[in-house]
Curated annotation (Swiss-Prot):
ABC transporter domain: residues covered: 5-246
NCBIfam families in the record: ABC_phnC (TIGR02315)
Source organism of the structure: Fusobacterium nucleatum subsp. nucleatum (strain ATCC 25586 / DSM 15643 / BCRC 10681 / CIP 101130 / JCM 8532 / KCTC 2640 / LMG 13131 / VPI 4355)
GO terms assigned for molecular function: ABC-type phosphonate transporter activity; ATP binding; ATP hydrolysis activity
Gene3D superfamilies on file: P-loop containing nucleotide triphosphate hydrolases (3.40.50.300)
Protein's recorded name: Phosphonates import ATP-binding protein PhnC
Catalytic activity: phosphonate(out) + ATP + H2O = phosphonate(in) + ADP + phosphate + H(+)
Gene it is expressed from: phnC
Record's subunit section: The complex is composed of two ATP-binding proteins (PhnC), two transmembrane proteins (PhnE) and a solute-binding protein (PhnD).
Enzyme Commission code(s) on record: 7.3.2.2
Enzyme class, first EC level, given as a word: translocase
Membrane topology: Peripheral membrane protein
Keywords, ordered alphabetically: ATP-binding, Cell inner membrane, Cell membrane, Membrane, Nucleotide-binding, Phosphonate transport, Translocase, Transport
Cellular compartments annotated: Cell inner membrane
Positions bound to ATP: G37, E38, S39, G40, A41, G42, K43, S44
Length: 247
């Protein structure tokens, strides 16, 4: 299988505190990977490093065959256009229509005048509507985002991540504020995207049972280190207990 992410000996510090310690793992194209662990284990930091939002102190992160940690900012931005990041706080703009929120990624490809006057092409609008249809909220395209529920806003964020037709989607705690029903629906959307479009998806999740149900593999972090990285079907109750066990 083709490797899309290769991490070797990654170290990340904040000042004198080491957040990630000698992290190494591979992710194959088309896999769903869930990252689990206690709060403060380094999950969100790892996600941001993988996307290039955070620099690292040592080690390497390869996207396909390119080490993104050695790129200049312009080159890094070109690579990041092949990735989408669903932030924990979603970054949905309440006073914009749903479809306008989904169109936001296309702004990076436009000049100042086009951005100023929201000049989007017919193809971009069609792509945005297509993505909203895939997450089941195309009827809300011309609704102001401030009127949406939490679950609907999460769907908008996922649709926005699909709009640029990227290879890799990273979602930081995409279901943390949702009830069980909405959490399952959101994970089913990720699974459909994964199966039908062969997208690689990396998720930061607190719900271990949902992680096991919808992921191909689970990467468990503990105190900034990899505690285990294995197929979801191989993860047992003892593994989970040890991840969340305090010494």
């Amino acid at each position: 299988m083709e490797t899309i992410i290769e991490v070797k000996n990654l170290v990340k510090n904040y000042g004198d505190k080491q957040i990630l310690k000698n992290i190494s793992f591979n992710i194959n194209k088309g896999e769903i990977i869930s990252i689990i662990g206690e709060s403060g284990a380094g999950k969100s930091t790892l996600m941001r490093c993988l996307n290039g939002l955070e620099g690292i102190n040592s080690g390497s992160i390869k996207f396909y065959d390119t080490d993104i940690t050695k790129l200049k900012e312009k080159e890094k931005n070109s690579i990041k256009k092949q990735m989408a990041y669903v932030f924990q706080d979603l970054n949905i703009i309440d006073n914009m229509y749903v479809i306008e929120n989904v169109l936001v990624p296309f702004l990076n490809r436009k000049n100042f005048i086009q951005v100023l006057f929201n000049q989007f092409s017919k193809q971009e609008y069609e792509r945005a509507l297509y993505c909203l249809e895939k997450v089941g909220i195309s009827k809300l395209a011309y609704t102001k985002a401030k009127y949406l529920s939490g679950g609907e806003k999460q769907r908008v964020a996922i649709a926005r991540s699909l709009a640029p037709n990227v290879d890799l989607i990273l979602a930081d705690e995409p279901i943390s504020s949702l009830d069980e029903k909405n959490s399952t629906q959101i994970m089913e959307i990720f699974k459909r995207i994964n199966i039908k479009k062969n997208k690689t998806i990396i998720l930061n999740l607190h719900n271990v049972e949902i992680a096991k149900k919808f992921s191909d593999k689970i990467l468990a972090l503990k105190n900034g280190e990899i505690f285990f990285y294995k197929k979801s079907a191989e993860v047992n109750e003892d593994d989970i207990r040890k991840v969340y066990q305090t010494s």
